[in-house]
Structure formats: C-alpha cells, structure tokens
Amino acid sequence: MKNKEKKNKKKKNFLSLVPMLIFMLVGAAFGVLFAQIDNGDMGIYGNIIFFAIFILGVYLAIFFHVIVHEAGHLVFGLLSGYKFSSFRIFSFMWIKDESGKTKFKKMSITGTAGQCLMLPPEEKDGKIPVVLYNLGGSFLNIIAGLIFLVVFLACGYTYFGVAMALFALVGIATALINGIPMRLGGVDNDGYNVISISKSREAARAFQIQLKVLEQLSRGVDIRKMPAEWFEIPSDESMKNSMAATIGVFGCERLVSDERFEEADALMAHMLEIESGLIGIHRNYLVCCRIYNELIGENREDVIEKMLSDEQKKYMKAMKSNITVIRIEYAIARLYEYNDTKAEKILASFEKAAKTHPYPIEIEIERRLIEIVDQKAAQACIQ
C-alpha cells in the first residue's frame, strides 16, 4: 500500500510539472523563432522590450485560446446532441435560466479558466456520447493552432509571422495540457474526465447526473426537489472514481440544504477519510461544510483550528467570491472570532456576490444558512 502511495505521489508530482514544461518549451521555441528576425543588434533596451512583448503576447494567446477551447466544447457538444446550459470565460458567465433566456452572470472556480456546461442527450443503447464533448476544446485548439501555423509559414520570419507562431504554439500547448489526462490545480482536466467516465457504467451515469443537476439549478430548481435517485451515495469502491465521488459531494450538499447537518457531517467525514477519487477543490469544499457544521454545533475551538489548515485557508482565499465560502467566513467571524464588525463586511461581500451569482436558488439556501448562524450567535449572547 505504501509503495503504491509513493508511486502515485511521484506520478502526481511529475504530472503537475507538465504544464510548466510545456510552456517552457513554448517560450524556448518562440525565442528561437524571434532570433531569426533580422532586426540588428537590439541592445539591452531592445531585449527588455522583446521580453515585455513576449509576455503580453502569451497572455493574449492564452486568453484567445481559452475562448477557443470552451467554444470547442460548445460546438462539438452541439454536434453530439448536447444542449446549451452555460458558458464561462474566467469569471464571465452566460447562462440559460428557467425562462430559456441567456443571462450574463459572474462566477469563478479555482483551477479553471473557463467552462462550458451542457445538458446531455438521451441515452442510446444505454450510452451517451462523451468523447467529442469533453475533448472538443482540445480539438478546436489544435485546429486553430494549425491555422496560425499556416499563416506563420506564409509570412515567414517577420514580426507578424512570429506572433502567429506564438499563437500556434500556445494553441497546441493548451490542447496538450487539457487533453493529456491529469489533475490541474485540484481539478480533473478533459482527458482525465474521459478516462473516468469510460471506466464504468456508474461513472457515465454520474457524469450525466452532474450535468443534469447543474442544468436544473440554472432553471431555479431547489436541489432538495430534484429526483432522490440522483443523490444516492455510491459505495466506497465506486467513489474511487472521481465522477462517482462527485455524486457523493452533491449528496452532502443536498443534506446540508435540507439542514440535516449531523447526517451530512458524518458522510463528509467518511468521504474525506476513505481512499477516493475526490478532486482537490471538492475535498476543500467538504472541509468548508464541516467547519460550518462544527460552528453551528458544538463549536469546539481545537476542532476548528485543525480544519483551518494552511491548505484550507489558501483554498478559501482563492474562492473568496464564492457565496458558500463567504458564508463560511461569515460563520467563522461571528461564532469563532466573535468579530461582528468583520462579519458585517463579509455579509456585504455576500450581497455583492449574490447580485451576479448564476444560481438564484443557491442564494436563497445560503441566506437561510446565514440566518442559522445569526440564531446561534444570538443564543450565545443570551447564555
């Protein structure tokens, strides 16, 4: 078991270096190409300008290819029979609501630059298409990269030509980073998702349910009113698959929404303890929920301190605009730090985030959970 854990850790550490290695190669290739331009002796200031232009070019190319990548999911998803649900680039999100209208909202998820969510088609022979939808982003990055490569070959070693080469290189790099199966920043990439879905019928069903739950949320359906069979907790063995483990997370979320806190906490503690396929951000999310449960329950200082690890604080800082994380921060300020002034500022942040949050029904649930914090604080004052 220990040897297996060491092997998995080495593999994880190596894969975490892959994106950096790919972009180091992009930088080296761009430097070689730029050196071919006949521009005389640039001098120190020329080199500084070159470096600044290169950094700016990389950012522009990444931004462009994030859009291309998510558009690829959309295009290949539509070709596979999927229906549009939401489209996000960084924190800018367009989502179809309960009336069928597409509205602009804001939401960011740590570890992701974008996301295109779609409603899967009905099963055919017990299966749904998953490869084109999941890998469509990488496919379109490659197509765009090849187009830029053709333009570079036509223009040669000119400034414009080399700029096109940079866009080609970043396109291919984006395709590789998303297509080579690995976990990035606590999130499974597209290639990893395809492998996870393909491992079992249960994993494929879990993938369908995830998309259906998110689509229902966008239509204003309360998670407690969705079909109960969607939230049946998979076995420990099944949850070794990341797709199935996500259903366990949804199950925990449903229990919390239903204010069954003790039941939810027991399940979350179990999921965090067993060997599972839980992705990093879901682990941190469950810890957030457990912190809340502890605060409104026994409120033991040593237990809360243990859960508020450096890693957990880092996650909460990265997700500081997420309404659930804001609610947890509010609970910490009121029930752990006893700092009402800080709590008021956090509550103002919640109201600001709520204005652009894509799922109105989640705002209602979060407000109710905040009220429970206030009730607990009031009881503490009386005592």
Regions found by a protein language model. Give the residues of each.
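Hydrophobic transmembrane alpha-helical segments that form the core helix bundle
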Residues: P121-S218
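Topogenic membrane-insertion module of multi-pass membrane proteins
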Residues: K2-V58, I109
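Small-residue-rich helix-interface/hinge motifs
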Residues: G57-P121
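Polar-ligand-bearing catalytic/cofactor-coordination segments
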Residues: L79, Q115-K124, M182-E263, A269-E275, ...
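"A position-specific structural signal for the A-helix of alpha-solenoid helical repeats
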Residues: F250, C289-N293, T324-L335, E366-K376
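Start-of-helix signal in alpha-solenoid helical-repeat scaffolds, especially tetratricopeptide repeats
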Residues: S238-T246, H282-C289, S321-T324, I328
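Alpha-helical adaptor scaffolds
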Residues: E253, S257, L278-N322
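Alpha-helical repeat scaffolds
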Residues: K225-D236, F261-I274, E298-M316, Y338-A353, ...
